């Protein structure tokens, strides 16, 4: 049996709409995509391996160019054949939801892996390790899964006509979109429709997941990120619908927000982040009945709210957010506005613990200064050799997403520490010299020394992003902010 025949059999056995009667039709659909020359054999009978073989066959037959863009587009067209139509998938999802929310998400998650929408093979390349810090074990990841952009492809994409469709990579217009040079293939992409606050939203998984069951909840309308009462209501509504998932929103301002501020969306999933394990350092009273509140022992300034009353919980979140938006304290460089520009917002995260709903509200400030041009509450220059990008939702919760360059760069730091010939980049010199001076380095412990040091740098990164520091001045300033909520 050829790889093409095996693939057709897999399509018929898949959750798609095809049956044995459709075999000839599906065979001809695949032939049309890959060409009529002899199919290249697959390395095994896994669906992804069969797809790889058919993509190579298409290159051999001159149907596509041997470029990442062409290969991705064809692979996703093939995987579309094993994927139910959006209407069918949505019906099945909500049918399974009647059994339990987890039954529904398990079905959708497994399907999104099986059809290679979630790039499990690429994600497996990521480097992940824990790091002990004064704030508990942080999670360090070096992100190797997202493909590097080919300079030639970037140049070619610049010459492509831009018709603004899809409007952005989070729009529902991406569902089933073929893709093009410089824009990802989405033929096998599916979105579950749900209602939040009376509006239609979508639920999908992230193709390059940063944690288990990494989900995206997106507004059907293309409108900018905003944090307000509706945000808190929506987050709690999602946790009501999917109590086994947490969900949070990136902040709605540059520097402290995520990389996609143009389309309202949230991220969630099934993972207990370090911040969720962090204890309450001291309780506070917000004057809202039925809501417990406390300052979390965490490098970023966080107030944890707990209640079974969703309206009271939302009221408490709004009180913190609205007070913070207009709150300044010059003694600790906290300024709500400069020259009419707003600097304050929050990063909210919701989850359910037993019968309680929990909202963590993280205070954010995106000011810049002559001393800190990238951001006063952003990784400072001396830690930017490890992390200089924005501190978004996932990192706020204690999971570092570090750039791919670090895999090779840290290997060279290791050689330097062992006095071996190396090509260590200059920006790591001061840090590496300090590691050398303060540790007895051996071949057996060099990796542990570096991993621990990277973890400590990430803890410092989070501390830089925290508006109220864990010193006497910072804690007194935090208490003044809490008092301001009673004014």
UniProtKB/Swiss-Prot annotation:
Q: What is its EC number?
A: 2.7.7.12
The catalysed reaction is: alpha-D-galactose 1-phosphate + UDP-alpha-D-glucose = alpha-D-glucose 1-phosphate + UDP-alpha-D-galactose
Pathway connected to this protein = Carbohydrate metabolism; galactose metabolism
Pfam families, from UniProt?
Answer: GalP_UDP_tr_C (PF02744), GalP_UDP_transf (PF01087)
Compartments, as annotated in UniProt: Cytoplasm
Q: Which InterPro entries match?
A: GalP_uridyl_Trfase_II, GalP_uridyl_Trfase_II_CS, GalP_Utransf_C, GalP_Utransf_N
One Gene Ontology CC term in the entry: cytoplasm
Tell me one GO biological process term: galactose metabolic process
UniProt entry tagged with the keyword Nucleotidyltransferase? yes
Q: Cite the GO molecular-function annotations of the record.
A: UDP-glucose:hexose-1-phosphate uridylyltransferase activity
**What is the top-level taxon of the source organism?**
Bacteria
Q: Does the keyword Transferase apply?
A: yes
Q: What keywords does the record list, in alphabetical order?
A: Carbohydrate metabolism, Cytoplasm, Galactose metabolism, Nucleotidyltransferase, Transferase
Record's family? Belongs to the galactose-1-phosphate uridylyltransferase type 2 family.
- Could you tell me which NCBIfam families the record lists for this protein? galT_2, PRK05270.1-2, PRK05270.1-3, PRK05270.2-2
Know the name of this protein? Galactose-1-phosphate uridylyltransferase
Its taxonomic path starts at: Bacteria, Bacillati, Bacillota, Bacilli, Lactobacillales
Recorded name of the encoding gene: galT
């Amino acid at each position: 049996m050829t790889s093409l025949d095996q693939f057709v059999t897999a399509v018929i056995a898949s959750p798609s709409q095809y049956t044995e009667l459709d075999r000839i039709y599906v065979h001809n659909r695949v032939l049309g995509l890959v060409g009529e020359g002899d199919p290249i054999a697959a390395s095994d009978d896994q669906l992804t391996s069969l797809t790889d073989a058919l993509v190579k066959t298409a290159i051999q037959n001159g149907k596509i160019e041997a470029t990442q863009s062409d290969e991705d587009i064809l692979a996703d067209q093939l995987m579309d054949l094993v994927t139910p139509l959006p209407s069918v998938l949505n019906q099945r999802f909500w049918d399974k939801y009647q059994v339990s929310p987890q039954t529904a998400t398990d079905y959708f998650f497994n399907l999104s892996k099986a059809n290679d929408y979630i790039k499990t093979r690429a994600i497996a390349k990521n480097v992940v390790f824990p790091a002990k810090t004064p704030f508990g074990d942080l999670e360090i990841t070096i992100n190797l899964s997202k493909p590097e952009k080919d300079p030639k492809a970037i140049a070619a994409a610049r010459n492509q006509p831009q018709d603004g469709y899809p409007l952005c990579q989070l729009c529902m217009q991406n569902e089933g979109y073929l893709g093009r040079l410089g824009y990802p293939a989405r033929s096998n992409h599916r979105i579950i429709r749900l209602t939040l606050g009376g509006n239609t939203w979508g639920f999908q998984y992230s193709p390059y997941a940063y944690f288990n069951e990494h989900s995206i909840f997106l507004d059907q309308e293309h409108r900018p990120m905003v944090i307000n009462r509706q945000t808190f209501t929506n987050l709690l509504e999602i946790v009501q619908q999917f109590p086994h998932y947490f969900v949070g929103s990136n902040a709605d301002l540059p520097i402290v927000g995520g990389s996609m501020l143009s389309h309202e969306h949230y991220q969630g999933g099934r993972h207990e982040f370090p911040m969720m394990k962090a204890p309450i350092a001291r309780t506070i009273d917000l004057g809202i009945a039925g809501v417990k509140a406390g300052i979390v022992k965490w490098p970023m300034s966080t107030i944890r709210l707990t209640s079974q009353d969703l309206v009271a919980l939302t009221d408490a979140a709004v009180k913190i957010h609205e007070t913070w938006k207009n709150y300044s304290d010059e003694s600790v460089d906290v300024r709500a506005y400069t020259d009419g520009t707003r600097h304050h917002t929050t990063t909210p995260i919701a989850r359910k613990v037993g019968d309680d709903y929990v909202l963590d509200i993280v205070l954010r400030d995106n000011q810049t200064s002559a001393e800190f041009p990238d951001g006063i509450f952003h990784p400072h220059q001396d830690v930017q050799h490890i992390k200089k990008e924005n501190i978004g939702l996932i990192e706020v919760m204690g999971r570092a997403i570090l750039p791919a360059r670090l895999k090779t760069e840290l290997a060279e730091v290791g050689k330097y520490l062992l006095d071996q010939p190396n090509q260590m980049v200059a920006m790591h010199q001061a840090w590496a010299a300090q590691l050398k001076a303060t540790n007895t380095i051996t071949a057996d412990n060099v990796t542990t020394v570096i991993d621990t040091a990277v973890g400590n740098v990430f803890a410092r990164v989070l501390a830089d992003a925290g508006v109220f520091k864990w010193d006497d001045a910072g804690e007194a300033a935090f208490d003044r902010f809490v008092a301001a909520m009673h004014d």
